[in-house]
Amino acid sequence: MANNKKMKKTTRSNLLMFGFVIIFWAVIQLISLTGHMTSKLNGLLIPVCAYIVMAISLNLVVGFLGELSLGHAAFMSAGAFAGIFFYTTAGQMLPKAAAVLIAFLLGGAAAGIFGILVGVPVLRLSGDYLAIVTLASGEILKNVLSALYVGKDSAGIHISLKDQFSLGLAPDGKMLIKGAMGILGIQKFSNFTVGIVLILITLAYVLNLMNSRAGRAITAIRDDEIAARATGLNLTHYKLLAFVSAAVFAGFAGVLYALNYSSLVADKFDYNLSINVLVMVVLGGMGNIFGGMIAAILLTILPEMLRGFSQYRMFIYSIVLIVMMLFNQAPALVAWRQRLVSKVKGEDRNAEKKVETADASYFEEMKNKSSEETGNEESVKEEK
């Protein structure tokens, strides 16, 4: 019965997260329909969705696996460049919906492959060493993409890491990737509903994974790696599963993010982006998916909302970060939050107590009945 109650609590929590995302979508639609949508808010919707997906996916590695990764922006850039490269070339010959869908799939696949290439050697490390290597891999990919020149002419596709003149393009040739300038002339596809659908897919995958046998193995590795190894768990397999899954969804987020702009440059995906996403996860609570989502929304919108307060923007931003950290970590505030949640869920707890009382009464009645039957049997034996 305890397991059933725990399962019901988990299901209720998961449904609340899905409900929050749907309500968020409905509120934005209502704002848009009533004509209160500002250009600033409209421009933030897709980045908010992308960062929510990034925070949820990084939580797999940092929160549930317990490993510090500082290269999450690299997976985002791998997905963005792979997906947008297809979208701006072969995608032009397809219906837009099909081109966007294939761009997402290719972006996720590219990020997953890069995640495997990085994860297989790197996940043998841990702690600071893992953080340093993932950070370095992200910077390496950023520099490679910044030096990448790709062109196309009647002879085919030409690639160079030197400059565009070394491509040897014919007069009818066209530059596809211009080094540090990246990919230009992207036909923007900014669809908030697509972003919400991606969040729901990410949530569904991560929650199902963490409630599965593989998810329990991942958290067991986080809690005690030595004990997990002693039980016969394949640590490399489960670590790689979490790492590559996070990379794939970061790739999806990269495609979503890149489709919101008319150009794509590698410098957007530097180590600062990885740190920002990590801050979202830490402030929301490591292993707390809902908290990470809230932190992603606040930390994406807040800096833009404070641009009018140029002199005090960083001060206010810092205060908000400190308050969020205290709210999540300070023992007194944690206890207050738990009491508040207990009051909100008071009816559910009373119902559970009634069930427990009924169960206890039932078992006590059965126990008394059994004792009476035993006493009667002993009386019969004595008479005989």
Language-model regions, residue ranges each:
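Transmembrane alpha-helices and adjacent helix-loop boundaries
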Residues: 2-384
